[in-house]
């Protein structure tokens, strides 16, 4: 029988993702904290935090899971033509804090954000420790889009993206998958399917299959050059 686990502030093991609730889909545990070691343990086992500002910390492992395989991200002919016309430039790990702040801005028709100050502080610490990373899209000196997430071995766990100009978040995703191919990453965890991810080629897989893929690649050593701050070219 699936049941909700309650975590305290002492570090403890997460329950198996198989025990997550089906309604709401994937809710596994409640409580605990956002210390780096707890967050890294969560992602290592296919679990991530997602909660509103007034809620306790909620931990999830949904079924199905949204994933990308690097090299299988879709780019339509119209998007390719659009991006070729843009004077944008792209960087890796140049403005992590600003990317998080961009992602934290409430979306249209949303009253608030799940990327709270607490979340931002926790992931900035992960970035400082070399675990969380960002992709930036620039128009001149203006940050117009980007995304951030965590690297666990040869797996990139995407967290959020944003745009301030049309298609800038899609460009960030395309740049990310290009970079991950070059650095021999094997899997992108996109967490929960939505129309935006689906349009880019995300696929839903059963949680058990996702955990199998995660287990296969999470202990592999990543290319040490993967997250050196750099300016890169989007190849279209």
Curated annotation (Swiss-Prot):
Cellular compartments annotated: Cytoplasm
GO biological process, one term: protein catabolic process
Pfam families for this protein: Leu_Phe_trans (PF03588)
Top-level taxon of origin: Bacteria
Keyword Acyltransferase attributed: yes
Molecular function GO labels: leucyl-tRNA--protein transferase activity
Keywords: Acyltransferase, Cytoplasm, Transferase
EC number: 2.3.2.6
Disulfide bonds, paired cysteine numbers: none
A GO cellular component annotation in the UniProt record: cytoplasm
EC top class, as a word: transferase
Record's catalysed reaction(s): N-terminal L-lysyl-[protein] + L-leucyl-tRNA(Leu) = N-terminal L-leucyl-L-lysyl-[protein] + tRNA(Leu) + H(+); N-terminal L-arginyl-[protein] + L-leucyl-tRNA(Leu) = N-terminal L-leucyl-L-arginyl-[protein] + tRNA(Leu) + H(+); L-phenylalanyl-tRNA(Phe) + an N-terminal L-alpha-aminoacyl-[protein] = an N-terminal L-phenylalanyl-L-alpha-aminoacyl-[protein] + tRNA(Phe)
Keyword Cytoplasm recorded: yes
InterPro entries assigned to the protein according to its UniProt record, in alphabetical order: Acyl_CoA_acyltransferase, Leu/Phe-tRNA_Trfase, Leu/Phe-tRNA_Trfase_C, Leu/Phe-tRNA_Trfase_N
Homology family: Belongs to the L/F-transferase family.
Protein's job: Functions in the N-end rule pathway of protein degradation where it conjugates Leu, Phe and, less efficiently, Met from aminoacyl-tRNAs to the N-termini of proteins containing an N-terminal arginine or lysine.
UniProt-recorded name of the protein: Leucyl/phenylalanyl-tRNA--protein transferase
